[in-house]
Amino acid sequence: MISVGEALAKVRERKPLVHNITNFVVMNTTANALLALGASPVMAHAEEELEEMVRIADSVVVNIGTLDKFWINSMIKAAKLAKEYGKPLVLDPVGAGATRLRTKTALEVLKIGATIVKGNFGEISALLGEEGKTRGVDSSTYDPERAKELALAVAEEFSTIVAVTGKVDYVSDGKRVYAVYNGHELLGRVTGTGCIVAALTGAFVAVNDPLTSAVSSLVVFEVAAEKAAEEAKAPGTFHAKLYDWLYLLTPEDVERLKKIEVVKV
């Protein structure tokens, strides 16, 4: 079984530098989440500095939430550089399936090479050419049985680790599927929570193996959400408490509170 506590301890000890090419909505949010966890964030989008930044970073996170032609060029270049320099890359295909541009961009990055792909049911469906399941940047449908199948199929198709988020999260390496049962309904009332998970995944995969990282980032974030919800009953306070608990959680806490299992598909 995956040791989430050990994975968290490695992040805290090594404080990896995570290079984020992310969207306008969540830059501040994800930077603060990484700092609270114990990692170091950098948000760099200019194509002219990408090679220097990727070279010094421990991992790269590409989030397609607010696209334009300049950012797309930077994302493609960052993916190529991550591959060249052997840096793990996390892809968050925000809103894939909602527009052709988003789906095309996500697939371009994915085909260059992504270590981990994290998305909701609709976004991951779009990567297999299934349409009509993404509304804006949120998934309009969720089928737990199909989510398991999607995680396995996309992981196998693109030789990557896939995390499909939802009421239950499913993570696969193309052979096994892990279910993560942690979380809280207030996560759906705060923008950018999925983007935070992608950023945290970047921190974990900088110092852990990809499958462990994908599972551990979900568990740590969702246990933090559970603890935050014990102290906050509405979205504003809950959001602030999320940062507190990303900072306060110990490896022992997450080992005790994790709810994961290997499931059959």
From Swiss-Prot:
ATP binds at residues 118, 165. It catalyses: 5-(2-hydroxyethyl)-4-methylthiazole + ATP = 4-methyl-5-(2-phosphooxyethyl)-thiazole + ADP + H(+). Pfam families: HK (PF02110). Substrate binds at residues 43, 192. Its EC number is 2.7.1.50. Keywords: ATP-binding, Kinase, Magnesium, Metal-binding, Nucleotide-binding, Thiamine biosynthesis, Transferase. GO terms for biological process: thiamine biosynthetic process; thiamine diphosphate biosynthetic process. GO terms for molecular function: ATP binding; hydroxyethylthiazole kinase activity; magnesium ion binding. InterPro entries: Hyethyz_kinase, Ribokinase-like. It is an enzyme of class 2 (transferase). Coiled coil: none annotated. The keyword Repressor does not apply. Pathway: Cofactor biosynthesis; thiamine diphosphate biosynthesis; 4-methyl-5-(2-phosphoethyl)-thiazole from 5-(2-hydroxyethyl)-4-methylthiazole: step 1/1. It comes from the Archaea. Its cofactor is Mg(2+). Catalyzes the phosphorylation of the hydroxyl group of 4-methyl-5-beta-hydroxyethylthiazole (THZ). Belongs to the Thz kinase family. This is Hydroxyethylthiazole kinase. It comes from Pyrococcus furiosus (strain ATCC 43587 / DSM 3638 / JCM 8422 / Vc1).
